[in-house]
Amino acid sequence: KESAAAKFERQHMDSSTSSASSSNYCNQMMKSRNLTQDRCKPVNTFVHESLADVQAVCSQKNVACKNGQTNCYQSYSTMSITDCRETGSSKYPNCAYKTTQAEKHIIVACEGNPYVPVHFDASV
């Protein structure tokens, strides 16, 4: 079974590009990362930074998660991210997404030993 840390990498890491390459980025990435297999995942964020930089956020600013848990951390610096949001015309299995590139602080939930990101909570 896929570990929570590996799932985070599959769902949220794209270190190979510095930003979304085109307006079609989300349509391609959501499909290739298996985020449209059983349904269209409504919202997803990809982070264009090194895995080490994103893992380091687990030792940065401790904040409360949206669900009230206390194991979330906010990055000290902004990061290059791409938000993928399902469009109104999207219908499974033909999931369609709007691609939005941004520079924001990320908030991730961390768990385990080593202490690594397992959930993308928000960007601010």
Swiss-Prot record:
It holds the Pfam family RnaseA. It catalyses: an [RNA] containing cytidine + H2O = an [RNA]-3'-cytidine-3'-phosphate + a 5'-hydroxy-ribonucleotide-3'-[RNA]; an [RNA] containing uridine + H2O = an [RNA]-3'-uridine-3'-phosphate + a 5'-hydroxy-ribonucleotide-3'-[RNA]. GO terms for biological process: defense response to Gram-positive bacterium. The active site is at H12, H119. Glycans are attached at N34. Pancreas. Disulfide bonds join C26-C84, C40-C95, C58-C110, C65-C72. It comes from the Eukaryota. InterPro entries: RNaseA, RNaseA-like_dom_sf, RNaseA_AS, RNaseA_domain. It is found in: Secreted. Substrate binds at K7, R10, K41, P42, V43, N44, T45, K66, R85. One of its GO terms (cellular component) is extracellular region. Keywords: Disulfide bond, Endonuclease, Glycoprotein, Hydrolase, Lyase, Nuclease, Secreted. One of its GO terms (molecular function) is ribonuclease A activity. Monomer. Interacts with and forms tight 1:1 complexes with RNH1. Dimerization of two such complexes may occur. Interaction with RNH1 inhibits this protein. PANTHER family: RIBONUCLEASE, RIBONUCLEASE PANCREATIC. Belongs to the pancreatic ribonuclease family. Endonuclease that catalyzes the cleavage of RNA on the 3' side of pyrimidine nucleotides. Acts on single-stranded and double-stranded RNA. This is Ribonuclease pancreatic. It comes from Capra hircus (Goat). The lineage of its organism: Eukaryota, Metazoa, Chordata, Craniata, Vertebrata.
